[in-house]
Amino acid sequence: MNSLVIILIAVVVLGAGYLGYGRWLAKKWGVDPNAKTPAVANEDGKDYVPSSKLTVFAHQFSSIAGAGPVQGPIIAAMFGWVPVLLWLLVGGVFFGAVQDFGSLYASVKNGGKSIGLVIEKYIGKAGRRFFSLFCWLFTLLVIAAFTSMVSSTFNGFTAGADGAVTKNFNGAAAATVSMLFIVVAMVFGVVMKTCKNMKEWLKAIVAIVLIVAMFAVGMKCPWYLNGDQWNYVIMAYLFLASVLPMWLLMQPRDYMTTFMLIGMLVGAFVGVLVGHPDMNLNAFNGFTVVSSTGVKSYLFPTLFVTIACGAVSGFHSLVSSGTSSKTVKNEKDMLFVGYGAMILETLLGVISLIVVGAVAVGGKAPEGLTPFQIFSQGIAGFLEKFGLPNSVANVFMTMCVSALALTSLDSVARIGRMSFQELFMGDTTDTSKMPVWQKILTNKYFATVITLFFGYLLCKGGYSNVWPLFGSANQMLAALVLIGVAVFLKATNRKHAMLYPPMLIMLAVTFTAIVFNVIGNVQKFQAGTATFLVEGLQLIVAVFLIVLGIIVAITCIKKLVLMKKENAEKAEA
């Protein structure tokens, strides 16, 4: 199959999904462009900041478009390109975008509250606490997986088969650019806040010029640190991202990053159109696949939890309800921000599939390379067609894939901190009325340190060990969010039946996957090949996730059923 046909099919399906199904949802749910949003009603200059549609979209897209749409499809390609493409398109339009839009809508309609607090309002405090604990544990997995990926990418030193250590210019140069991004973003944030009336086109030009300048500096001044050192640097950055006002760091950084990511997408898209490489992957490799290391994987549920962010991701709901809902200036922007950002991410997932298909050998993805390396080298090959030197293209792509993970990391660090605070939040947010222990546990600095500490411990196991559990927990969170949004829609007399199919399917997929994960880790302990810091911690987290998932699912479904009975009784009366 020629990749040009695949990309055109994807664009048509995703475009039709946005214009057709997305607009239909907005109409059925009752998006009101005249309603006052939480960002306007509760503006505080910190979390609640009314922002333009493009600015909120930039934050949403750059936060959700993490490593998932690159990592997932490339790993899942072991089953063949057909099942991966089908799940990306079906999942993106009817599962992922619906969840992202729905959670953003529910949050905006409830004062910008997180999805956990929305659950408390319609289900009860116990449901909220269990959900918040689930979310917090999940954020630890995201921090662990993505920190490990970024530190591995930034690692300035590579050990060869003979033990000789050589410098990794691509990683070191990308690291310099990424660190410059943090400083420049803060300056840009101050400028945007000071010059509120700056035209959007002027802000865009300034952002693009700054990106080019930082890229040039990175090429000249690579920063060589090893992976462990980068772990510490990343944790320090995440601390700042968690506690600083949104307008000062996260919003301007996400805004600038989006131009870089869209540039990457456009370059890759045009590269596919010009080069239109053939898909060298097999179309379908069967329902059971055995890797070169002898590990057996089943199409169900492995495919669905591996692809993760490109099709549906619970993490997106935390971004939608945790940060984006507090910056939406007009309800009419929600379709573009919530549904639209997910559609664009799905397109990124399709491009990742095409990249691995183009570089595949003998019907399989190249062995010995990480998904990031496959993606970076594949896109760099596309960009070479435009005369861009391979070394420059490789650094640019390394920088882009690192930016994908970093923008998700800073959002999830903030969301993890907020989830931890919500766990111990009582009926009042007035600290003067709280006991000392509650003041400490709900303090944003303390909550951030605790969240990052446990995320760092899990990170030591490496992303390849954390990813399977992350994928399962991620999709389980999506299922729970869909149930929660359905409860909200039902309670407010809005159409909600469209959420039932994705909700039930994701519950079946994720509980199966996470049970498989527990069984696999137990077997490693029985074989004597497990360690506490890797399999042990994962096993503990997995068991907690299963228990919490069951409790939240039963609580929410019970509420849905009871509401139906209550409504029926009212109708009879």
Roles of regions detected by a PLM:
Residues A67-I74, G91-Q99, S103, S107-G111, ...:
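Membrane-helix boundary/coupling elements in multi-pass transport proteins
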Residues S51-G68, G227-L244, M256-T258, G267-P277, ...:
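Hydrophobic, membrane-embedded alpha-helices of multi-pass small-molecule transporters
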Residues K125-L140, G340-L347, A393, E422-G461:
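Loop-to-transmembrane helix boundary motifs in multi-pass membrane proteins
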Residues V272-V289, I343-G378, S411:
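Extracellular/periplasmic helix-exit of transmembrane alpha-helices
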Residues N2-L19, A76-S107, G116, A175-F181, ...:
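Extracellular loop-to-transmembrane helix junctions
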Residues G189-T194, V209-Y232, A241-S242, W247, ...:
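Hydrophobic alpha-helical segments and their helix-loop junctions in multi-pass secondary transporters
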Residues R23-V49, G72-I75, L85, L89, ...:
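Flexible loop linkers connecting adjacent transmembrane helices
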Residues V13-V70, T258, Y298, T302, ...:
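Membrane-interface "cap" regions at the ends of multi-pass membrane proteins
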